Amino acid sequence: MSLNRGKVLDAALRLADEQGLAALSMRKVAAAVGVEAMSLYNHVSNKGDLLDGLTARVFEEVDVPDPALPWESRVRLLADGLYASFARHPVVVRALAAQDANPRSAGALRVIDALLHALLDAGLSEEATARAYRSLLGMLFGSVLTGAAGGVAAKAERAEPVGAYFRRMATPSELPSLHRVLPALESGDCVQDFEYQLNLLIGGLGSAS
């Protein structure tokens, strides 16, 4: 089976998901697709191009909604699609947040364009659209990385677990609000939290337009 850029990027994404970006190398990707490292340069220019390509792959997993739908529905569909794709590949979110990668492909740009189109259709100016777009990305990145951190097994060792410390310190007399809300904080759901934020954002955009 002949090698192409898509197969290289798919292999790189699987490797990054399994081992993290720090472990991603041209040599390891080459081994994953069964070729010598030099053969990869027929399909990707360098590691930066590789990172951009696998990031674009994640954006391309998102379906672009019908532009005839109301803008609120389009924003929600795109945001939920991006959340689901990012949650499958949180390693890419880390690369985006660190500005180590950019989604460089026509398919990825169509997703971004569709989101901006929906925001413009909300009646926002170009400047407000840019702010809303950045706000949504910040929500996406934060929610996905928070969820991913919750699943990490290896954490810094402490004499007292963080949860136990908060419960011990948050007494009704000293920290009454923290004491009251702490059980809800400890039982949070990242997906529900993201939907809550998204509802606030869409509601706020509707009021601002």
Each language-model region and where it sits:
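Helix-turn-helix
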Residues: 7, 11-49, 53
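Amphipathic alpha-helical packing segments from all-alpha helical-bundle domains
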Residues: 97-123, 127-134, 145, 167-176
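Short, basic, alpha-helical segments at the C-terminal edge of helix-turn-helix-like DNA-binding modules
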Residues: 55-61
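Hydrophobic alpha-helical connector segments
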Residues: 63-110, 126, 133
